[in-house]
C-alpha cells in the first residue's frame, strides 16, 4: 500500500494521512479526492511512501486521483515549503490560495493535443465512384490519399470534423493523438528600432553577463533613461527565448505597461490580477505553465506562477505595502521575488523612487547592486505648502487657508482632498435635546470622545478636557455618544462648498463604475469638482485632471507608535505626483498638520527622500532597530482576553528558555493589546520579539511552536506569526 500525506484547504499546521492502492501513481503537487469528516474534500499530495504491513483500520482510503502531473513547478514547491518553515504559517491555505479558483474543484486540465488523420487500407482500396453523391467525403478522401491531415490544418483545407468522424465510423480513416509540445523558442521582433547610449549598454551587459542570481536597485533615474534601460533589458532577455515577470502593486499599472510594451515588441503578453474572470485567469495560468507567453504582468501572487522558463523578474515600487500579505501567512512579495530569482539563478530588478530602508541597507552591504545611469544631484522640489492647524480657524477639518485656496483654484481645475481613515470616522459627544455637539474653543472643530478615559480631545490643537456632565447650551443632562461617518462628512462638505460638485470615494464597494473607469483605472470626469478620497483608495486610481492635492491631516504619522510611520509617509508623499500621471507640470500640494516644525517633515519637504532616509537609518542603527536587528510579532485572537494573555505569557516563557539553548538574547515585549481590524468580534493581543540574529530567532521560534502546540490553550485561541512586521 502507498501512504500519502495530504494538504487540505484548512488553516491547520498539520498533514493528513491516507491510504492509496499500489496500482495508483500519486504525483507530489497533484490533486486527490479524500474523505474528511462527513464529506469529500479536494486535497494536494505533499509526499508519499510505500509500506507493506499497514494497519488499514487507522487510515482512510482516498476516493480518486485527479491530476496526472503536478500543478506546481519544483521551484514553486520549494518556495511554498520555505514560506511554511520561515513564516510559520499553515501550508493548506497557501497551497490553495495561489491556484486558480477553477482548480479548487475536481476540474481536470485538458492537455492540448494535435489530432492526425490518416487513410486506412480499406480507404485506399475503396472505389471512389461510391462517393459521387457525397462530394465532401470524396474531397477529404482524395486529400488523405496524398497526405496525413493535422487538426491545425482543418481551416487551411476547409474540412469539417463531422466529415472526418463519418469516415472514421466507416473505417476509411483513423485518428492518432500526438501531445502538443507548446513551448517553442519564439522569434521576437521589435516593432521600433532601439538605440542605446554607451552607459546603458554597459549597465545592461553587467546585469545580463552573469548566468546567476543578482539583485539590482533602480532609483533616482529620469523617465527617459528608465524607459531606454527597460526596453534594452526586455529585448535582450526575450531574444534568449525565456519568460519575463513584471510585478506591480496596483492593477492600474498593468494596462499602462502592457499597452506600452505592445508598441515596441511583437511578443505574447499576458496579465494576471484579481479582477480577471476565473476562466481568463485560468487560461493565462495554463499559458504561463506551458510557456506560451513571453511577458507576464501581474500583481503580488503572480510570483507563484509555474513558469516554464523564467529569465527575469522586475518588481516595480518595491517599497509598497501592498506587497505585504495581511492574511495569516504574512510574507512579503519583495522577499519572495528575491528568493525566486536566487533559486532560478536569474537577475531581479527592484524599482522605486523611494526604496525601503531595508533595500537601501542591502545596497550598503553589497547584497544588492545599485544601477547608476546618470549623475543625480538634483532634489525634486515638490510644490508644497504646510498649513499650521494650531494657528488656523478650522471648519470640519479644513483650514480657512485651504478653503480659500480651493475657491481660488477651482475654476477649470479639479481638487483632490485625501483624508486619513482615522480622520473620517470618529465619535463625538452630542446633546440629545438640542443636538449641540461639543466643539474646541480654540479651532472650533469637533471634540472627539475617548470613552475609556472619559475625556474630550481635539486632534488639531491637542487640547483635552474632562467629559462634561451636562450640555453647555441648554443645560440638559441627556448626553449621547454620536458617530461621525460618511453621511455626516457629505453634509458638512456641501455646507462649506454649496455650489461645487462633489465625488466621494470612501469605500471600494460604493464606487460608481461610470465615474471611475475600471479598465483604465482613471477618474473619467474632466470638469471642475472636488474629489474626497481615503489614503488607501487614492493609490488604486489615476486622477489626470487634478491640479490641487491636499492631505487633510497627517498627525497620525507623528503620533504613531510604529517607528516606520515616517518612512511610510515619506514614500506616500514623494509619490503623490504619480496620481495624476502627468510628467509636464506638478500639482500644488497642501499639508495640514499640528506639527509644521517637525524635523522629519522639514527634511522630507526640503531635502527629499534620500536625505531623510540617511538620517532615519542612523537613528535606527543607534537604537538597534531593523534593519540592524530582526523583529517578529506573535498575534493571538480570542473572544476572551484571558485566553490571549495566558497563551502569550506561556509563549514568552518558552521563548526565553529556548533562547538559552542557542546562546542568543531575545528582547520580548508584551503581551499587549493589538489594534487589528480583522475581526470585530474578537480581542487581539500581541507579543513583540527582537533578536540580532535571524537564524537564531527562526530556530527558537520553530522549537517554541512545537512545544506550545502540546498545551490545550493553543487550541482555544487563533494565533499567527508576523515575521518582519510593518
UniProtKB/Swiss-Prot annotation:
UniProt-listed Enzyme Commission number(s): 5.6.2.4
Enzymatic reactions: Couples ATP hydrolysis with the unwinding of duplex DNA by translocating in the 3'-5' direction; ATP + H2O = ADP + phosphate + H(+)
Matching Pfam families: PriA_3primeBD, PriA_C
UniProt keyword annotation of Metal-binding present: yes
UniProt binding sites for ATP: 234
GO MF term list: 3'-5' DNA helicase activity; ATP binding; ATP hydrolysis activity; DNA binding; zinc ion binding
Cofactor comment: Binds 2 zinc ions per subunit.
Function text: Initiates the restart of stalled replication forks, which reloads the replicative helicase on sites other than the origin of replication. Recognizes and binds to abandoned replication forks and remodels them to uncover a helicase loading site. Promotes assembly of the primosome at these replication forks.
The protein's name in its UniProt record: Replication restart protein PriA
Gene label: priA
